[in-house]
Amino acid sequence: MNSSTEGRPTPNLPRTANKRGVARLAAVQALYQMDVAGTGVLEVVAEYEAFRLGKEVDGTQYLDADPQWFRAIVAGVVDEQLKLDPMIHQALTEDWPLSRLDSTLRAILRAGAWELQTRKDVPTAVIVSEYVDIAKAFYTEDEPKLVNAVLDRLAFVIRGESRGVKPR
C-alpha cells in the first residue's frame, strides 16, 4: 500500500476502470479517512465530490466516478455499520477479529458487505471481484485472499450464493 502526504492510502490501480469501480475505490478511501481522521460523512462526501472525483490532486489525476454510487456506498456503510460489523466478524476466522484489521481492510470489507446486502441488482461475482481488485491495489500479501474469502462467506449468508468458500 502506498501512502499519500495526508496519510490517506493511495492504490496502485491501472488507469482503465469503470465509473462504478472508481466509485467503489473512492468510497473505500473515504471510509478509511472517516475511520482514521474522524471525518463526518457529509464532510468527506463533499470533499471527494468537490476536490477529488475526476480532478487532479497533487499531480495525480483522479478518474471519473459515478457520484451517486460513491454517495450510496459511503452513506450506506455509515448507516448500516452496526449491522455490517457483526456479520463481517462472523465471516472472519476466530484469530482475526475485525478490530485487528487495519482501517483500509475494514473499509473494503464494510463496503463489500454493504453492497452484498443492499445491491441485489449487482451480481455477487461482480461485487466480490471488484473489492478483491481494490484489495490487490493496496496490498501485495494475503489480504486480497482474505477479502475474497470473507465476502464469499457473506454472499452465502446474505444471498445464499457462494463462489466456493464454505461458510463458518
Curated annotation (Swiss-Prot):
Say if the entry is tagged with keyword Transferase. no
UniProt keyword annotation of Ribosomal protein present? no
Concerning SUPFAM superfamilies, the annotation shows: NusB-like
Instruction: Recall the GO molecular function terms of this protein's record.
Output: RNA binding
Record GO cellular component, one term: cytosol
Highest taxon listed in the record's lineage: Bacteria
| Similarity comment: family membership | Belongs to the NusB family.
Job description of the protein? Involved in transcription antitermination. Required for transcription of ribosomal RNA (rRNA) genes. Binds specifically to the boxA antiterminator sequence of the ribosomal RNA (rrn) operons.
What's the protein called, per UniProt? Transcription antitermination protein NusB
Report the gene name.
nusB
